[in-house]
Amino acid sequence: MATPHINAEMGDFADVVLMPGDPLRAKHIAETFLEDVREVNNVRGMLGFTGTYKGRKISVMGHGMGIPSCSIYTKELITDFGVKKIIRVGSCGAVRADVKLRDVVIGMGACTDSKVNRLRFKDHDFAAIADFDMVRNAVDAAKALGVEARVGNIFSADLFYTPDPSMFDVMEKYGILGVEMEAAGIYGVAAEFGAKALTICTVSDHIRTHEQTTAAERQTTFNDMIKIALESVLLGDKE
């Protein structure tokens, strides 16, 4: 039945949901890549859709910006609508010279300055990691598509406008591939409620060089990332 934030019924969502931050990007993904699409959520404008990809039922829904927002939607999808796998498909900022604009990054793990996982893990450090099989399937899908994807640690920041830019130097030293705002929270929610999760990002801006993509491009042109996510779902079904 409907929750305070999702006006859908059990069965409206597939067991796998792709989740961009922007609900308009969710709409674009559904209309571009899925067939037999129907809208399954529109509460607060957080659009959700279900359709099929090569005959496989898949859903896509926005999760908003930041860990608090994405945690609400992912928790409700898992506990109230039976979702088993969540793939965040979003953007990130690069801090390393060898990571370029529009590179695809697969978040094997997610560091964070947020305290949410310490709250759920009795004030201990929780290793926020993606599901191994989902990572492997995404890597295999990228190779099959001829897309060079980077795999490693990303950083989920609570603040978009950071007061301490020297932290980017630390991130670079520790090999962080990209900075975003949600993955660590999604991985924590998935672990808490027995689901699986993965984050795939496209580099939308470079924090060092100040290169950036436009908002319109972020909404519509990060197609390699979406294809990797969708094809990885099909590979997962073969296991």
From Swiss-Prot:
Pfam families: PNP_UDP_1 (PF01048). A purine D-ribonucleoside binds at residues 5, 180-182, 204-205. Gene3D superfamilies: Nucleoside phosphorylase domain. Keywords: Glycosyltransferase, Transferase. Its EC number is 2.4.2.1. It catalyses: a purine D-ribonucleoside + phosphate = a purine nucleobase + alpha-D-ribose 1-phosphate; a purine 2'-deoxy-D-ribonucleoside + phosphate = a purine nucleobase + 2-deoxy-alpha-D-ribose 1-phosphate. GO terms for cellular component: cytosol. Phosphate binds at residues 21, 25, 44, 88-91. It comes from the Bacteria. The active site is at 205 (proton donor). One of its GO terms (biological process) is purine nucleoside catabolic process. Coiled coil: none annotated. One of its GO terms (molecular function) is purine-nucleoside phosphorylase activity. InterPro entries: DeoD-type, Nucleoside_phosphorylase_CS, Nucleoside_phosphorylase_d, Nucleoside_phosphorylase_sf. The record marks 218 as: Important for catalytic activity. Signal peptide: none annotated. Homohexamer; trimer of homodimers. Catalyzes the reversible phosphorolytic breakdown of the N-glycosidic bond in the beta-(deoxy)ribonucleoside molecules, with the formation of the corresponding free purine bases and pentose-1-phosphate. Belongs to the PNP/UDP phosphorylase family. This is Purine nucleoside phosphorylase DeoD-type. It comes from Cronobacter sakazakii (strain ATCC BAA-894) (Enterobacter sakazakii).
